[in-house]
């Protein structure tokens, strides 16, 4: 009888272990299916992200091309004006000067249309964000005394700094002794 109880206990234990093993196998199968689903989802997201990145790169290139085309279309009339000026180069120096001045004025209008403005020049306060000091000249300290090369900005973005001489107080000979 004791042997029978022992066999019953063993059978129950074996049955419990079998049920537990079956439950673990079912959980493992469910986890494997979930892992497969998550892996598929990950791969789809990875592909979607790669496609998004490629679209953004293409869009950026297209916008850059549009910007260049816009600038070129705006600048081509200046080339046309220069061609016309060369045709009339036989004319008097004064008419050439007037033609070049008209071309320059037209070019400034184009720049303004593109949102580009000239950096403030002579008489304005020296600003290292927009001015490059290339020398000193007698004049009001801290002010731009002379512009050697114009500077331009588009909003807060600097296209090119103005190359300027900054004013400094003229030292008297007495100060030098």
Swiss-Prot record:
Keywords, ordered alphabetically: Chaperone, Cytoplasm, Stress response
Coiled-coil region: none
GO CC terms of this entry: cytoplasm
Presence of the UniProt keyword ATP-binding in the record: no
Localization terms from the record: Cytoplasm
PROSITE patterns from the UniProt entry: GRPE
Pfam families: GrpE (PF01025)
InterPro entries: GrpE, GrpE_coiled_coil, GrpE_head
Main subcellular location: cytoplasm
A Gene Ontology biological process term: protein folding
GO molecular-function term, one example from the UniProt record: protein-folding chaperone binding
Binding partners and assembly: Homodimer.
Family listed: Belongs to the GrpE family.
General function of this protein: Participates actively in the response to hyperosmotic and heat shock by preventing the aggregation of stress-denatured proteins, in association with DnaK and GrpE. It is the nucleotide exchange factor for DnaK and may function as a thermosensor. Unfolded proteins bind initially to DnaJ; upon interaction with the DnaJ-bound protein, DnaK hydrolyzes its bound ATP, resulting in the formation of a stable complex. GrpE releases ADP from DnaK; ATP binding to DnaK triggers the release of the substrate protein, thus completing the reaction cycle.
Protein name per UniProt: Protein GrpE
Species in which this protein is naturally found: Thermus thermophilus (strain ATCC BAA-163 / DSM 7039 / HB27)
